[in-house]
Amino acid sequence: MTEQQAKELVVAAGLRLVESGLIARTWGNVSCRISDTQFVITPSGRDYLSLAAADIVPVSIDDLSYTGHIKPSGERGIHAEIYRYHPEVQFVIHTHQEYASVLSAADVAQFAPGPNYPLLGGSVVCAAYGLPGTKTLRRSIRTALQTTGGGAIIMKHHGAVCFGKTEEEAFLAASDLELACRDYIMARYLQQKQLPQADDDQLRRCALTMLAKPHSGKSNYFAPPYCNSERTADGFLLQVGDKQLKVAPGRLPAGLPPEAALHDAIYKANPDIQYILHSDAPDAIAVSQANLTLRPLLDDFAQIVGTQVKTVFGPPAKVAGALKHASAVLLGNHGALCCGATAGDAAAVKMIVEKNCKALLCGTLLGKVTPISKVDSLLMRVVYLKKYSKQISANKG
């Protein structure tokens, strides 16, 4: 395969990953081997929907060096480790897929995927934690490669890396990994409870009984449909079901849902917030009923959402205040408000909050749940806010 062909294949694979739901926005990365000494990989901080072949970067397997002005993915080191260990591997994808990410936050070092998933081998290994892009993470991947015979590795508190002799094989490994992780979580629950079958709601209810802390104060009540909104020059547009209502700041007409006061207070107290999305996903609702502070179980939560997300039962001003240092807040019993400077940012926050909630619930059923350390969480948050988010904005322009 020529370098140009490999670049075009990587661009197409990036689009396929987004469409499949295995990655979103700039998360994850894709590479293709072009020789015994080089591979091409997606650039750092670029939206997959805007990539062209000219944006894909050749990288040395030996020393990770590259040429040109476009910076390759910060995770190029884990790709190089795989190409070095497996000369037959031609394609690697790093994903933040849901159930593999959920399992990465659980107290599980490895698990047997079973005969239905032959591409995963006899054991799926969870590589030890390392901050994104670090030598520590590369060493963890190197160790995991020596343990597993399959085409997928879970990365602790992060996601997964899947690989194969072809693009198709790598994609199938990623798809199989997602199914195998979901199967494993359910099988463990059924085994613990000695049940023949169960559904996701049963798992959530069980986890909630283990997590919930009593709340004796006053609780707000917001009736569905919940509201989304976006800031305008003279207030904000409130989306209630299929209706869009213009609202002037500080002047809420009668008949608006009570949630409108929250949006008004948030925009008043947080000038950088331009969009608010309400997550009523079952996992977010369940965690919002637990009266806890949600901490990062996954790297992308620490980076994009914050070092903690509080549960607030109180008045609008308290809800708005909880967003001073985070991009989301849990509304007691009513899910989460997810905020951003753009519609895409708010959607990303919503997706990540929901995934982190699922990780907490499922992880609780599987053993002890340990968040990412406060130091590492703060470091990732600062780096993201000062560097990576600006890089994304610049690339959009």
Where are these regions (language model features)?
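Glycine-rich flexible loops
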Residues: 1-397
